[in-house]
Amino acid sequence: MASLVLSLRIAPSTPPLGLGGGRFRGRRGAVACRAATFQQLDAVAVREEESKFKAGAAEGCNILPLKRCIFSDHLTPVLAYRCLVREDDREAPSFLFESVEQGSEGTNVGRYSVVGAQPAMEIVAKANHVTVMDHKMKSRREQFAPDPMKIPRSIMEQWNPQIVEGLPDAFCGGWVGFFSYDTVRYVETKKLPFSNAPEDDRNLPDIHLGLYNDIVVFDHVEKKTHVIHWVRVDCHESVDEAYEDGKNQLEALLSRLHSVNVPTLTAGSVKLNVGQFGSALQKSSMSREDYKKAVVQAKEHILAGDIFQVVLSQRFERRTFADPFEVYRALRIVNPSPYMAYLQARGCILVASSPEILTRVEKRTIVNRPLAGTIRRGKSKAEDKVLEQLLLSDEKQCAEHIMLVDLGRNDVGKVSKPGSVKVEKLMNVERYSHVMHISSTVTGELRDDLTCWDALRAALPVGTVSGAPKVRAMELIDQMEGKMRGPYSGGFGGVSFRGDMDIALALRTIVFPTGSRFDTMYSYTDKNARQEWVAHLQAGAGIVADSKPDDEHQECLNKAAGLARAIDLAESTFVDE
């Protein structure tokens, strides 16, 4: 992930989780640190900030940033998130984005981590029913929308954000949330209508977006933290009032990060071999025999010329007393990836370690990165090299990858200027914690009459999770899988106030529904009471003409078991202690 500009170009914090939690800093030190934060702008700097703010408003900017830059050696992104969101507030919309960037030689810690909480506005869509909540204006409206994606786009069209120097090259504020796989039904209304969708057994939103005015960005290279508050001028009677209120809101945000009563994070030791698969997952949305029958049916469609490929998935279920945030902390160790995310949304919590972009738009350049073709990592650099050549000589995997590159070119071409679509990189091998993937990069220049939302609509869902031809493959997925996919194989990420977009593909993503259940268990010990959570781990396999049903089923099991290792680690570290 080269940029979460939006930039989920964020990174796991490098300090140990136990440090920076305030346990080694007395009350006096905390107060001193807090005071230093508020006094870092002298009178001249304050006047300059106010002058730039008012000048921006006079020029027509109606959403303007105020920011402070502080030392980050007393905080980690994980701790900062816990400062902003209480441990027991698991339904409060909020997020933590981090990243480990991949390359041909291995991994590098991404430069930025981004934390956000308390969105000023939310949009929740379920089929065509949309609820818009403006928490700042204390208003709520419900409406029918043929295409709910047009609502955040229309709201953004009213904004003229001020561009100021000193903001990091990362996501600094805007929309954050998820788009389910089923949002394709807003576009393909005739062939994939909601009325013909499979069973919706979880009743999760199809879209959830929060508008985050308060953002904390960790710069792991320069060892500092940017604390940012965006001011909506239209919510105030005057520019002076807007500036004063914005300044107070920013200081309140800083105060929460430097609270005297800094929350503590549960310490833990890594007792498991994180490179191994997790325990076998027994409960699935499809039995082994049903999945194998679906593979056979898919191959019949392929041999008949109906499709070339289809991705068939199944949803596994696991129950755990580990908290979703504890699972996220474990996942950072088990499977560091370009798009690490802990996202509390309406109806569910997403814990993700996605390796793949769904779509990115940065300064009107569209990026699509098909990731298809997989082989395990070697135990040494020499073995990695041997396995890399083995992967690139696998005709089946390479042919499948080229087909998906063509799909990516088609998706980008729908919204790009004529002649601007390019394959920047073709058939590169990227190394991840457990596997290597074949990767390509497709780019294009967004047409002048379109926005990033159009690029997202054209891409969602990508061919690597649906098939080819895409729409026909999705019709067969509806028939064969039997359940709505929800967040799996959709996307999560954000759209900045500047109109840049970075959306990750929701693979290697655990979904924790937050709705109440009648069969939830509780564990009571001397230390605490724990609630049982249901974790959904969904995985799929690309079916082609020579696919073997047993192998494809095992691929699903392996992918889900790799993700389940994070739950194993969270349980052994935080629950079994």
UniProtKB/Swiss-Prot annotation:
Highest taxon of source: Eukaryota
Gene Ontology BP terms: L-tryptophan biosynthetic process
Location in or out of the cell: Plastid, Chloroplast
Main location: plastid
Keyword RNA-binding attributed: no
Protein name: Anthranilate synthase alpha subunit 1, chloroplastic
UniProt family annotation: Belongs to the anthranilate synthase component I family.
Record's keyword terms, sorted: Amino-acid biosynthesis, Aromatic amino acid biosynthesis, Chloroplast, Lyase, Plastid, Transit peptide, Tryptophan biosynthesis
Enzyme class, broadest EC rank: lyase
Subunit note: Heterotetramer consisting of two non-identical subunits: a beta subunit and a large alpha subunit.
Transmembrane segments annotated in the record for this chain: none
GO MF: anthranilate synthase activity
Signal peptide: none
RNA-binding found in the keyword field: no
Pathway the protein takes part in: Amino-acid biosynthesis; L-tryptophan biosynthesis; L-tryptophan from chorismate: step 1/5
Alphabetized Gene3D superfamilies for the sequence: Anthranilate synthase
Reactions that this protein is recorded to catalyse: chorismate + L-glutamine = anthranilate + pyruvate + L-glutamate + H(+)
Range annotated as the organelle transit peptide: 1-34
This protein's GO CC annotations: chloroplast
Database matches in InterPro entries: ADC_synthase (IPR005801), Anth_synth_I-like (IPR019999), Anth_synth_I_N (IPR006805), Anth_synth_I_PabB (IPR005256), Chorismate_C (IPR015890)
SUPFAM superfamilies in the record: ADC synthase
Matches recorded under NCBIfam families: trpE_most (TIGR00564)
EC number: 4.1.3.27
Activation and inhibition: Feedback inhibition by tryptophan.
Function comment: Part of a heterotetrameric complex that catalyzes the two-step biosynthesis of anthranilate, an intermediate in the biosynthesis of L-tryptophan. In the first step, the glutamine-binding beta subunit of anthranilate synthase (AS) provides the glutamine amidotransferase activity which generates ammonia as a substrate that, along with chorismate, is used in the second step, catalyzed by the large alpha subunit of AS to produce anthranilate.
Record organism: Oryza sativa subsp. indica
